[in-house]
UniProtKB/Swiss-Prot annotation:
Signal peptide (from-to): none
Region (Disordered): 275-311
InterPro entries found in the cross-reference section: B3_DNA-bd, DNA-bd_pseudobarrel_sf, LEC2-like
Name of the featured protein: B3 domain-containing protein Os03g0120900
Any GO MF annotation of the entry: DNA-binding transcription factor activity
Binding region for DNA: 37-142
Main location: nucleus
Keyword RNA-binding in annotation: no
PANTHER family xrefs: B3 DOMAIN-CONTAINING PROTEIN OS02G0455900-RELATED, B3 DOMAIN-CONTAINING TRANSCRIPTION FACTOR ABI3
Source organism per UniProt: Oryza sativa subsp. japonica
Amino acid sequence: MEFITPIVRPASAAAGGGEVQESGGRSLAAVEKEHMFDKVVTPSDVGKLNRLVIPKQHAEKYFPLDAASNEKGLLLSFEDRTGKPWRFRYSYWNSSQSYVMTKGWSRFVKEKRLDAGDTVSFGRGVGEAARGRLFIDWRRRPDVVAALQPPTHRFAHHLPSSIPFAPWAHHHGHGAAAAAAAAAGARFLLPPSSTPIYDHHRRHAHAVGYDAYAAATSRQVLFYRPLPPQQQHHPAVVLESVPVRMTAGHAEPPSAPSKRVRLFGVNLDCANSEQDHAGVVGKTAPPPLPSPPSSSSSSSGKARCSLNLDL
């Protein structure tokens, strides 16, 4: 990890080098450093115990400590990225058999606002100029960094520009909403027309909801499943308790007037032969009465008569 640390130098010494810049009486210079290790802080590291546990392998490698000669521990001085010094007491706890940094650590946690999951990095200087100097840095955990990004970077979804506007948008009175969505770069699709009984309520809901939604979004597509085409319903006519679906071109032909003939003192109602073959469904004629043989032979092939005893 590369650290940039301000170094205090006299003004006369800083004036001779081009790599050193003065800023408010302090000169900034790049110091070569060696990264030692990282420690992801736990809830107990940033809790009320006010101590940071150093992993044993890193503690024995970089901060060797003789517990017999240093019962109270050592004071380690660090510099952060701004050059601010930090001093921690480093010691070994026999109860937990761990290496910890205690005094001064709680102040570092409060100032840097460390939370569980954040990472603390430790480094040391390299070369004659930075020999014996220790450095400390920190960074947020990845999920916090992602949460701080603007929502457009995390949830942006670019839709293809080939999706057209719905051709039925202007038929529902949403021309203004579609125009507003087009100006904002949104894809504004409206559902097809439904039954007339819900048309008034649907228009009112769409006029309120879609206009506000089109103004709030910059690029949005709304899809609706098309409704099946409406079927043509014909009124059903019931004749003699039999449902019949009436269609055009099948009207009942007008009935021709019947003929009445008086034969041998008996009145006969005679119907035309064409009317016998074009009877209407549902109408039944009374059963014919037997006629005398002489009358049936004389009227054969001309008309069928029924007796009407109207004496």
